[in-house]
From Swiss-Prot:
Keyword Mitochondrion: no
Pathway stated in the Swiss-Prot or TrEMBL entry: Cofactor biosynthesis; (R)-pantothenate biosynthesis; (R)-pantoate from 3-methyl-2-oxobutanoate: step 1/2
Needed co-factor(s): Mg(2+)
Protein's name according to its UniProt entry: 3-methyl-2-oxobutanoate hydroxymethyltransferase
Length: 282
């Protein structure tokens, strides 16, 4: 078993090797991803959609996020575990943001947190980093702000918007972010951001020039039954495999072939005779 991936190692990887990041929401998934050598596991607020069935990421709070982050932390022995700060857990004040971020490390045993936004959250990032809490930033298509964007729309498509995005990345890096997720932005803009900051960029729908990539594990494995973004590559169709297995289970229960003799527990012959005798005396 390799040692835990650390924040300094993530930062030092820039320009040397590509980083892999995936979401995870429970113990077994974290275990499998960890054994696959994934560098970072993000307990994303996408939990709301792909695990709990909500229509957006706004429907989870600190209680759910801490609960699932704890499960992932128990399964991941090598990967860096990052807790995603849910909507309104860091926007109200720097003090509240710092307190909630601390809960991810103290109670849920994560090694870092992630939050969305540019310069407006720089004070929160700075306070967290000064308190010893590593922070991953998130720019571009930030799902918690989808209502403001008018839906899940690509960001940074104009020269002015791209300029602001690059500046935001620089501000976040200066505030102390150890990496920054770039979601749903043009590839050339992502390349410019990557060149402009000293910490790794992690792309999701941001092209091949980022320092690493992140995807939602349910999308990767074909486990989500709703819309899958263009930038997703499905590496398996486990949803269909699960459906086939469960259909076979139901059929075998109905036709009596499960459980078979190999699934039964027996009783010693002498004890069986005693039991039969006891029944006969009734």
């Amino acid at each position: 078993m390799k040692n835990r991936v650390t924040v300094p190692e993530i930062i030092a990887s820039k320009g040397k090797r590509k980083l892999s990041e995936l979401t995870a929401y429970d113990y077994p998934t974290a275990l499998w991803a960890d054994q696959s050598g994934i560098d970072m596991l993000l307990v994303g607020d996408s939990l709301a959609m792909v695990v709990l069935g909500h229509d957006d990421t706004l429907s989870v709070g600190m209680t759910e996020m801490l609960h699932h982050t704890s499960a992932v932390a128990r399964g991941a022995k090598r990967a860096l575990v990052i807790g995603d700060m849910p909507f309104m857990s860091y926007q109200v004040s720097v003090e509240e943001a710092l307190y909630n971020a601390g809960l991810f490390l103290k109670e849920a045993k994560a090694q870092a947190v992630k939050l969305e936004g540019g310069r407006r959250v720089a004070p929160q990032v700075k306070a967290m980093v000064e308190a010893g809490i590593p922070v991953q930033g998130h720019l571009g298509l930030t799902p918690q702000s989808s209502a403001q964007f008018g839906g899940f729309k690509i960001q940074g498509k104009t020269a002015e918007a791209a300029k602001i995005l690059i500046e935001d990345a620089q501000i976040l890096a200066e505030a102390g972010c150890f990496s920054i997720v770039l979601e749903g932005i043009p590839s050339n803009v992502a390349a410019m951001v990557t060149e402009a900051i000293p910490v790794p960029t992690i792309g999701i729908g941001a092209g091949p020039d980022c320092d690493g990539q992140v995807l939602v594990i349910h999308d990767v494995l074909g486990l989500y039954d709703r819309f899958v973004p263009k930038f997703v590559k499905k590496y398996a169709q486990l949803g269909l495999t699960i459906k086939e297995a469960l259909t076979k289970y139901r059929e075998e229960v109905e036709n009596g072939t499960f459980p078979g003799p190999e699934h039964e527990f027996g009783m010693a012959e002498l004890e069986a005779k005693k039991l039969s005798g006891l029944e006969d005396k009734k």
